[in-house]
């Protein structure tokens, strides 16, 4: 029986690997322009670090059999935050870091049992900057990354934003014993569940109306102001969205604010966001991030420096998205150097070396061909190579 990869694992072909590398290099060039330094967090961490003090569920972590509790990272933020607060604690703030690498998440397979998902991410983390200034830099950087990726109009990119402070505001009139149930219903857009919770009739009606409160930031903030009055948080969000309007419009990114939006991992204690694009089948999340001050404090950051925010881009979905569009750059075809029976391998190797000096990719056929047509057929079979035929 042929060996199969583990459930959830994937074998990438050479073209996919090269595309992933090219995308990561594009993003890295943007991060460097903005003054971010590259780090390489370990794939294996202690479970208490990976679970971020309970913010990440234990079932999401791939555990390793070892003498101490270890696991594979489900994301890179916790590992980078730990490094920022320990080995890099003496470096001045703001501390700007970026990393690229594989993350592993565990989930239940459809047929039962464990399924391990392996994905490539590339992202940035900014430490030591309080709200809302860090978010203004990070989202501006995200727009610069979007420009470098060159999404197309058919992708309809949209930046969905939420804030834990907005959720706290929605829950403030709810009796404490009911807040967890109401919060779950709001996050899951569960209208029926919200209607069954024993709330005062006017409060239930308000929450049901706020369940549909999502749209342009100005419209949403105006509606929230009518319900909760003036709030400093509203001013911060207005400032952030005003700054984003120009860069987002230039890249065709639509801004959307949703007070009930909360991410899967409960790392975040401030702004949360994700960038969503359309595909032929369904929308896909290509970037996500937010503020995680509590995580930085748990890692031992000093008072006054206990701030952290960042985002990551999902390379594999972006690769698939761009491969379906015309945005991929045109590159010169790969060459195949082949020689006739009247020539020699030495001559072919010399020709290959010449092409490499010109910066062209060239492979070589190590055995002679009796005719040019056979060499052309081999070049086609090998993937549409351009033939360089040597026949003195």
Curated annotation (Swiss-Prot):
One family name in Pfam for this protein: tRNA-synt_His
GO terms classed as biological process: histidyl-tRNA aminoacylation; L-histidine biosynthetic process
Pathway: Amino-acid biosynthesis; L-histidine biosynthesis; L-histidine from 5-phospho-alpha-D-ribose 1-diphosphate: step 1/9
Keywords: Amino-acid biosynthesis, Cytoplasm, Histidine biosynthesis
Gene Ontology annotations for the cellular component aspect, listed alphabetically: cytoplasm
Localization, UniProt: Cytoplasm
GO molecular function: histidine-tRNA ligase activity
Family as reported in the entry's similarity comment: Belongs to the class-II aminoacyl-tRNA synthetase family. HisZ subfamily.
Free-text function comment from the UniProt entry: Required for the first step of histidine biosynthesis. May allow the feedback regulation of ATP phosphoribosyltransferase activity by histidine.
NCBIfam families listed in its UniProt record: PRK12292.2-1 (NF008939)
Note from the entry: This function is generally fulfilled by the C-terminal part of HisG, which is missing in some bacteria such as this one.
Quaternary state and interactors: Heteromultimer composed of HisG and HisZ subunits.
Record's protein name: ATP phosphoribosyltransferase regulatory subunit
Species of origin: Parasynechococcus marenigrum (strain WH8102)
Source species taxonomy: Bacteria, Bacillati, Cyanobacteriota, Cyanophyceae, Synechococcales
Gene for this chain: hisZ
